[in-house]
Amino acid sequence: MLDGIQRNLYGFERSGRVFLDIVSTDMRKVVKGAKLIIIGVPALSHEYYLKTLVPLLEDGMIIHTFTDNYASLLLRKLMREMGCTKDVIIGGWSSAPYGTRIEKICGFWTNHVGIKYRAISLRGACLPMSDIDDFMESVKYLPCMDSVTLGEGPQRGDTMLDIGFANVNPVIHVPASLLGVSSMENWSLVYGNAPDSYSMYSHGLCPSICLSLIHI
């Protein structure tokens, strides 16, 4: 089940039950014959998944990574190193099209996913940039990007490096975590709260820390 507040400027909402055609640890089964591939894993996992993907690439595939975090650069590098010459379009985005939280009830994780916000515009690029027209055109066929497509639309970045630097998370999360570490530790040690109820945004940030972020 997917629903939630879905905050966005234009009031775009989409809720309902989601049925997955396939769930597998065998990537070959998942990507075989696919035209559009979405990679949405943490940056620390990029190398493992991309190395697994390279031998499975097929001509005509279009790969979108949310959030890119230089995954497109890494994928092209791995293709060269592994001798892959498939004709694919590789690109990524500066952030995710929406932010979600899995609902937890009485200590149990449920199958209910709440969307907290939806993006109305995202910055994207591909490598090489000569593929940018086809890459941007493929966005129309990604339902996860509908709030962007029907919002202010996707923005074309200058290069893949531009997309990497356009991600604000490193600028926000790292200083907020380091400067708010006392709040993080005291959240459970002093105040007795459940560790997983801590929120960097709600409990770690304060006006003085936010002021320091402006100067970074």
What do these predicted regions represent?
Residues M27-R28, H46, I132:
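Residues at or immediately preceding the N-termini of alpha-helices
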Residues K77, P97-L211:
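Substrate/ligand-engaging "lid" and interaction regions
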